[in-house]
């Protein structure tokens, strides 16, 4: 494994199967967050921001936006509304691009190649017009007719696409799991009301993705709900990703403000950015202009908690021995990790 692959992390899921029933699910997410933090601690805000693109492949723009918001807040500088709106647009454009690729490459959304290329090109073109806003303490951009025209073209191209409902194109893939009844309910969705509790944990050097010891879900994984069968669960996850893509395109016309984080101490900053998988959070403390503390929580940290949806929904589930690995892979893909994963089936 290369150094960059090690920094990306990896997901390991082990299932113990006995007499055709899943008895245990061990979800281990290896995320080298302490190593990433050490690469940023001691850096100035500007130097840390220059390092970030080298550390993250997926959700790179969202990582940049969340970090900018945290660093600027820690430095006591508030970006004006126009800058924040532009940064939100930048994150949403990345979310749209990554979601489209996921829908086509993983879930085989029937989109003509030329239309997909056109949508991705519009996302890239619009993002390039906003790139200047990734500077620390960025100034607002002048009125940009080309940007607005590109965003309008993106919305029109999406409307013209009229993607079908997941059940319409996934049916052969879903039919395989119609008889697999899932277990207990997944964790609750993480809400903005829980930010103060999460902040208290982070201040105590507890960066676990949970609230008061309980896991949470974020992004499309949270909105998919608890479905009775594996077939319906996968269908709802793909549908949630499709709806999130449409929502992101709609939001480009009037970008929402990120959730407010109250009660921050001097030199402390928290930044949030929405990704295709849910909210990304960075917490930074500056000491004499240099980074003293850097913490981050990504959607994958929440959605692949050891006591998260895989364990809660799969324990006690009856499935044929020859089908369990394929089922596990489909459910992992539905939860959409931002890291590579591997699965292991132990026959007890």
UniProtKB/Swiss-Prot annotation:
It comes from the Bacteria. Pfam families: NiFeSe_Hases. One of its GO terms (molecular function) is nickel cation binding. InterPro entries: Ni-dep_hyd_lsu (IPR001501), NiFe-Hase_large (IPR029014), NiFe/NiFeSe_hydrgnase_LSU (IPR050867). Signal peptide: none annotated. This is Hydrogenase expression/formation protein HoxV. The lineage of its organism: Bacteria, Pseudomonadati, Pseudomonadota, Gammaproteobacteria, Pseudomonadales.
